[in-house]
């Protein structure tokens, strides 16, 4: 099913398009959380710290692929809005080969640098063995991440967010079932948790690839080398590379913060591992809504529907802020029972540190909600460079303040937690100022 976001009622079309994306990411988070929950409850604190640190690293690596796919998807949306089938096919071909080459290079580099990661991330000796074992397996799933995100980006670009949801649902259920079997039934340890995730990733990646190639003839142009055009390759590199930089800079900053967290030992590492999963789960719907909003803006920008863009922007701000207020209240109130889901009740220090993190971050979700809308807006309007600027402001502030504040004995680790909302606020102010100064030019 295709959804034309240039014709349907503005708010209704955004919500109907966003809901399957939100549900899909909920499932994605479910199979990320499955690793954390099962490892934390059945393998202990050190294993939880290992998987948590490995997850942060994998998020950085896969963000490179995700950014390339998101940038290409914005261009696909514009071509769909313009009804330019020939240009769409050429963009598909150029993007597939470009992102596939990056994926192969990234996969080789990951294995080559595996043993050097311990020093870079400052991983304690008691955690490294489990972390290395987990990473060695999980790196094998990087090609599957490319397949799923590439074909999902095409489907979403033409307004179909339901099919990616279906494949993700199958993958999530399979991952949780395999997690339980491998970790608890077969005693495979952290390697079993990683194996479950990789198998599930290939099911969703190969499945969506086969479906899309069979259902949409224009996608088969990815195999036609004659469709490669120098101009199209330059377009893809321009759009996707800047979005990739935005995503990878964001996650590189988080990875640097992870290294700082690791220096505080296994208790803080375990608290951070669990709290970050809760945090991501809480604001994930508004992140997906920002991506849906971006597709809406891109299609209408391609169709030159400036009034719909303005109406969509107003509607998106109201929806996003309303959600953030509600979820902030819930996370603040239920921080302790949420931590208890992931951590054994006897680990009181871990739970206490996680609660402190959640109550600080959770109070400021409106900041990240606004930032996701700004990312989506500038990406859709062909200004991905501005998204990079906002990311540098947000993450640069976060990393700098985290290292500065945590070095003060009276503040310590809580300085890392406070650096996050401060970074969001500064990036929001930067993005809003730019929009106000360039509004006529942007929406022309």
Regions found by a protein language model. Give the residues of each.
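Hydrophobic transmembrane alpha-helices of multi-pass small-molecule transporters
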Residues: 60-63, 175-179, 205-209, 281-284, ...
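Transmembrane helical elements of multi-pass membrane transporters/channels
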Residues: 16-35, 137, 171, 200-204, ...
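Short runs within selected transmembrane alpha-helices of multi-pass transporters and secretion channels
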Residues: 69, 138-156, 164-172, 193-208, ...
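Small-residue-rich hydrophobic transmembrane alpha-helices
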Residues: 48-108, 145-164, 271-335, 368-390
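Short alpha-helical transmembrane segments in multi-pass integral membrane proteins
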Residues: 1-18, 76-141, 185-241, 297-364, ...
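Helix-terminus/linker motif at the lipid-water interface of multi-pass membrane proteins
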Residues: 26, 30-49, 118-125, 181-188, ...
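Small-residue hotspots at the loop-to-helix junctions and early N-terminal turns
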Residues: 45-56, 135, 194, 266-281, ...
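N-terminal transmembrane alpha-helices
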Residues: 5-43, 56-71, 75, 100-107, ...
